[in-house]
Each structure stands twice: as C-alpha cells, then as structure tokens.
Design a protein with these regions (language model features):
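Conserved acid/base catalytic micro-environments in cytosolic active-site loops
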Residues: 1-158
C-alpha cells in the first residue's frame, strides 16, 4: 500500500504502550517516534507521551507539550504541522475521544487537498472528538471503524 500511519494519541497513560501492543495486529514495523526520525512508508509511528509532534523536511520533530494542563491538543498541533509542511497525500482520521482535539486542523488538511474522516458518533465510546470534527464542516467521510479501514485502503490505492 505504501503508506505511513501516524498515531497521535492525547491520552498520556496509553500512548507509551501502543508501540508494544500494535505489532500483534500488523505486519508493519511499529516505531515510537524519536527526534529526527525519518518518515517512511509501510511503518506505523506512535507519538511519545507529553510531547508535541511536528513534521519538517520529511522528519519528525518533537517539542515539549504546549498545553500541559487540561486536555492536550497534540492532534491539532500535529495536523497543522502536517498541513503546512507535508507535500504528499494526507488522510486524517478522528476517532473516539474526549474534548475536541484535532477539529481545529481539519479545514487546513482539506485546504491542502487532504481527506478527512470522522468516526460515526453512534460507534464511538466517547463521541466528543468526532462530534467536534463533524461540526467543523470539514469532514469528507463519517464512517464506522471497520469502514474507516476500508476507506483508507481505497484512498491509498487510488
């Protein structure tokens, strides 16, 4: 398929475990992002905890978290950086979660030709994030989780 999957999770307790859990579910290498790591196709990249993630010149840049109190906005920070600095295809997906992280960057993703997807509210355990995303008016697809996977494959192949 030739895609990189970047998981930006704003839950601090879970994120450090994802790089240990996900290899059981994918043949792609799963990597915890470090400063200066190059973005490569056919890899899954996981943001480390308590860091903002940026991309510049095809490499990941980590900075101290810019919002240390309340719900972090690490998804918004990364997607804004992606919209500004990435020249390839972008597919941004917002799934179940608290608060509205990511929503403020979706129109920027669309403005550079990216595709945006939100999880269907009735399939989300915590619909705040997909609801905030949908309310922006900058969502191309609203799908159940199993349909999100199929849509990503179709978009990546097309």
């Amino acid at each position: 398929m030739g895609v990189a999957i970047i998981i930006v999770n704003h839950l601090r307790q879970v994120v450090t475990m994802l790089h240990e859990i996900l290899p059981s579910y994918t043949a792609m290498p799963v990597v915890l992002i470090s400063e200066g790591l190059a973005l490569k196709p056919n890899h899954v990249f996981i943001i480390p905890e308590k860091r903002d993630l940026h991309i510049r010149d095809g490499v990941f840049r980590l900075e101290p978290i810019s919002k240390p109190r309340g719900w972090p906005d690490v998804i918004t920070v990364f997607m804004c950086s992606l919209a500004k600095h990435w020249k390839g295809k972008i597919i941004a997906v917002i799934v179940s979660g608290y608060d509205g992280d990511g929503a403020d960057a979706l129109c920027a993703i669309q403005d550079v030709g990216g595709i945006t997807i939100a999880q269907k509210l009735d399939s989300a355990a915590h619909p705040d994030m997909p609801m905030s995303a949908i309310e922006t008016g900058c969502i191309d697809f609203i799908l159940a989780p199993e349909d999100i996977a199929r849509q990503i494959i179709q978009l990546a192949d097309g």
